[in-house]
């Protein structure tokens, strides 16, 4: 097909451009919107609970059997596990990039099933859960009582029943966890009364198993000469505290019966007293929402906000919802800035092109070519599975200056023909394209060859370069298509033959500006030529400058700080509080309240969420706490209130005020899924099978070495094996003499203290 066909048939050129623009708009509307490409490895999490066990027991009896079976699952990259003194076991299995998360979860579940027979009965009774999800927190919100009129059990139960089911149904949500517990019937046994009646906890468990049951008694009247048929119904599981108090434990010799209420205090409480939450000093329950892999983060968060806004309308009086962390806040702010830069770049390019072409008709042609090439790029991004993110948008900002070149070349070529005396813009366009067509294709292929090779790079950095480079290459390809089809047709329509008598007219202000600009440009050009001639004659100086430039390049490459992506102010700060081993829950809340007061005194803080019993950088239990600090909007904060300065200020205050806990403030990671913070996270491994206390000493020595380095500000660890514990030593011989077994003693201990 000859290029003059597009010039002779401008409608064809226009239809091609309109078609690719429509396809680009469709692609833009359906592309996932994220901050960065999904580069985090697919992760499958396995969770188990061994109630009453310490971390060592969890490690040996739960994590070890599970890891033995899970290890080596297909496409596994590495495995990481943690055990807590509250009986919780967490195993994270990381897979190679590109692994199907669904198949990974199925494969891990199959391995977990193989380990079920090796786990304690208490663990299998509660259940071992396997789930796939991204590690990044999509949203953290809290339900809090600003009137302090509800107890924490009611708030947690309301969130579990009314909010979480709605949240989990939102498209794109991978998981939603409540940092709280369900309503449960708490039976607090009285050991002294139990001893009087010669009872042990297993007697109570047996009574509960006998009388707190669901049953299907059946029906009668099914056959025979009956008028009606009836179904027999049993009351089922007990619901009220009084019903549990009436459970019969045993019959007494005097004819009376001993009931559960006689040997225990019964109340409706929490399943476990692991977590405590506060929002701005009020009782609360916090919920963490995780994203499903491949989902549109922007759309998911928008849907979540709609669900929460609707739920807010029906909340009991005094309850409110506070969003502590919202990935959309920074995402929208970042994309807004990139789009703003995109528009500014377009305007600047338009102005520069107009100043040099000095003709509005000529300027319109590149101005039309730019949005056509950029919008069409979104269609190809959709086809190859990319997303709208900061990398692809930044590539388009840079591409503006490149995609405009092809259109300018066409316009300048047609102008050159008109300067030669062509009286027909169509003929000038045809002749110009016969000369420029091959050159446009050649320069386009050369430019694309600069960016396409990065698509073959592997690893995390390769993913970043790939999205940036291929976006550039696609934009350049569409700019060439425009230069071969649309731009020549527009030249034939817009451009007019030069008027030879235009010099006799009175010059307008715009023409006088153009004349002055041309004179200034010619003056600068003469000076430039003079310097070029000077360097041509002084070749040694030219080579010397090149050598000096290379030396400076190497020097600055060595001294310039490096990183994957720059750290930015996301509007959120995370805090991790590590208390001394064995700290009680009441003491933990006292210290966390002091940290909360310290944070509240910072004027840049908008809201704060305190979570006791949960650590973002590791560990669960009373000795760990977390804080989510939401800063005021960027427009409401000064330059001296950016997140880095606030982090430093809070850290220094905490070091001075909080002496009985480690308090660390940090910014959330710029690339989600790799770590809990944007700092360096290291994991040490003991391959010698030595003692935990010796391993802890090695960790402390390593941390001291880190702190001694000038580039390290602080180093902390949540690992500490020195939690205070009582060693229970059972005399097996004495047990046999008494007619009991050691397991009977352990079961009794678990009934009272588990």
Residue ranges and their predicted role:
Residues 291-295, 301-348, 380, 388:
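Membrane-helix entry/capping segments
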Residues 272-295:
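Small-residue transmembrane helix packing/gating motifs
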